[in-house]
């Protein structure tokens, strides 16, 4: 029976990136996990296929070989004499070992003793408000991830049993094979470099040493955090295999755009429209700030559009500092609309009695323009 295409098994396109692969795998693994489907042979078969597909496609080298050669890349003897297939030596291991030894390099990628591997790092995207960035917060998040199996404590072996040293490589995880004029040391095809085999797999994790589960975590968001900041939670990523160290969880923060404020570092900017008469005659208005207080802004007579007023210390806190940015009020002057007859008459009268001193900028601008073009 022909093996299913790995991409079809995970339900992703061949162009899928690492994030899409991982997302598809988690979704399917949770759906077909044996714990959720007891005594369901079909679900167990699909679960194994999903694991196999993800294990191959998450490794860039294995994925490249599969994209080029298909399942033939992993069949026994696929190297024409090397034996063992891709997962047990294959293209990358042979090439890495040949060139590594010739160039004085090391052995290529290896697992530690007993097959222990560090768990994968995880990414979590979190969106917060500007108010939350101002005051800081403790957020509760739920992260689907692989955790150490509580039945076998990560060994992968059935309780009461132990993994055994691989008889093929004598527990080293590496074997030597003749390859033309070279003696090549490559990954053991029996234990896949772990150095151990599991005769009696754990019934819960099926020998993986890890299970997929959703965890609840508390994340401290410090006051003054900026958009695009990355927070690292050490050891909160996926559990390692066979007792290996866990990966890290990275929280990528984005701050929602605010209705009134724009942020530039620790400073805030707020555009405030005022009436034409307030700009001409002067006045005051109150501005609500992010610290929950109100600040009064005094507008002097003759204030022009674009004028900025600085409210010292009313901006954002500087991360891990006692300093605080400023709030800048940017004045916009609103031109009156839908005038009544009386309002129009008053404005026309005002225009008639106005002098150059009332509008020095516009008067001077047009005078300079006329002189420039007419000489």
Swiss-Prot record:
Please tell me where this protein is predominantly located. cytoplasm
**A GO MF label:** heat shock protein binding
In which compartments does the protein localize? Answer: Cytoplasm
Q: What is this protein called?
A: Chaperone protein DnaJ
Q: Where are the transmembrane segments?
A: none
State where Zn(2+) 1 binds.
149, 152, 202, 205
Q: Where are the CXXCXGXG motif repeats?
A: 149-156, 166-173, 188-195, 202-209
Q: Tell me, which GO biological process terms does this entry list?
A: chaperone cofactor-dependent protein refolding; DNA replication; protein refolding; response to heat
Native species of this protein?
Answer: Rhizobium etli (strain ATCC 51251 / DSM 11541 / JCM 21823 / NBRC 15573 / CFN 42)
Task: Indicate the family of this protein.
Answer: Belongs to the DnaJ family.
Q: Which cofactor does it need?
A: Zn(2+)
InterPro entries named in the record: DnaJ, DnaJ_C, DnaJ_domain, DnaJ_domain_CS, HSP40/DnaJ_pept-bd, HSP_DnaJ_Cys-rich_dom, HSP_DnaJ_Cys-rich_dom_sf, J_dom_sf
One Pfam entry for this protein is DnaJ_CXXCXGXG
Annotated Gene Ontology cellular component terms: cytoplasm
Q: What does this protein do?
A: Participates actively in the response to hyperosmotic and heat shock by preventing the aggregation of stress-denatured proteins and by disaggregating proteins, also in an autonomous, DnaK-independent fashion. Unfolded proteins bind initially to DnaJ; upon interaction with the DnaJ-bound protein, DnaK hydrolyzes its bound ATP, resulting in the formation of a stable complex. GrpE releases ADP from DnaK; ATP binding to DnaK triggers the release of the substrate protein, thus completing the reaction cycle.
**Domain J positions:** 5-70
* Chain positions recorded as Zn(2+) 2 binding sites: 166, 169, 188, 191
Q: Which HAMAP family match?
A: DnaJ
**ZnF region ranges: CR-type:** 136-214
* Quaternary structure (record): Homodimer.
Q: What is known of its domains?
A: The J domain is necessary and sufficient to stimulate DnaK ATPase activity. Zinc center 1 plays an important role in the autonomous, DnaK-independent chaperone activity of DnaJ. Zinc center 2 is essential for interaction with DnaK and for DnaJ activity.
Does the record bear Repressor in its keywords? no
Listed A to Z, the keywords are: Chaperone, Cytoplasm, DNA replication, Metal-binding, Repeat, Stress response, Zinc, Zinc-finger
Cofactor binding description: Binds 2 Zn(2+) ions per monomer.
